[in-house]
């Protein structure tokens, strides 16, 4: 039994833990030698931090217990040097949030279906009463067409064609030479761009990493010159205002053609 498996087994004994799931690249088959462990503990009550610290100290060379930057997490490095992130999620409230997307079709500004993707692609390590497996069955459904349309409508409007759209914001800050703001707005542009692209293909959003590679591999519908235009965008975003502006226009035009053809 590996040290990680021993750690998981010890967590089984915590009465608050309803399920343990392994997510991220180690669950989806996209892991490499640098991949960390993304571990999700679905709980019915908070697990005391002192108990968490006591257990993890046997397996980790570095620990940050009870970080709350995004979710409630223990961010650690295992004794073998591999990073491990342990996230604590209230089972009921988390699944209600997934249902809000999958069953009530609520779209966000980018990353709409990431948590849905996380649930249905996670590997179950422990499931005390079968509730996580039941949630996986509940949400393992075809991509709802109302959700698809809501994501595409909301995020294409963020990309272009409206006063607060990202393309116009990027052009304004690029003309000013504000590189920090250019970086910030291009990142937001990409969030909505990939949200549209995955929804258009009826695919759940895989998260923030390897998006260009995953889209190229998994999306049957891709805008014309998908990879080349992204390369040009990132190659000119700080150096050539005119080419940046022109590339943005090409990207939104090509995406809109794909939407118009396939929606």
Residue ranges with predicted function:
Residues 5-9, 25-27, 71:
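A generic local structural motif
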Residues 11, 56-63, 255:
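Hydrophobic, Leu/Ile/Phe/Ala-enriched alpha-helical segments that form helix-helix packing faces
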């Amino acid at each position: 039994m590996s040290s990680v498996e021993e750690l998981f087994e010890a967590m089984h004994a915590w009465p608050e833990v309803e399920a343990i799931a392994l997510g991220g690249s180690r669950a989806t088959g996209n892991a490499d030698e640098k991949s960390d462990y993304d571990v999700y503990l679905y709980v019915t009550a908070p697990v005391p931090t002192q108990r968490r610290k006591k257990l993890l100290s046997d397996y980790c060379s570095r620990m940050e217990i009870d970080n709350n930057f995004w979710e409630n997490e223990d961010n650690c490095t295992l004794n073998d040097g591999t990073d491990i992130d342990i996230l604590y999620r209230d089972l009921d409230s988390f699944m209600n949030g997934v249902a809000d997307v999958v069953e009530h079709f609520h779209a966000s500004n980018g990353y709409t279906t990431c948590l849905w993707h996380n649930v249905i692609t996670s590997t179950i390590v422990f499931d005390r009463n079968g509730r996580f497996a039941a949630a996986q069955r509940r949400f393992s459904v075809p991509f709802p067409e109302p959700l698809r349309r809501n994501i595409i409508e909301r995020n294409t409007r963020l990309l272009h064609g409206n006063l607060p759209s990202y393309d116009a914001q990027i052009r304004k800050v690029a003309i000013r030479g504000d590189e920090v703001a250019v970086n910030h707005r291009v990142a937001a542009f990409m969030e909505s761009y990939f949200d549209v692209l995955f929804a258009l293909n009826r695919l759940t959003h895989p998260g923030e990493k390897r998006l260009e590679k995953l889209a190229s591999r998994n999306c049957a519908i891709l805008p014309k010159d998908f990879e080349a235009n992204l390369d040009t965008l990132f190659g000119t975003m700080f150096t050539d205002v005119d080419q940046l502006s022109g590339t943005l226009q090409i990207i939104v035009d090509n995406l809109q053609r794909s939407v118009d053809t396939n929606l």
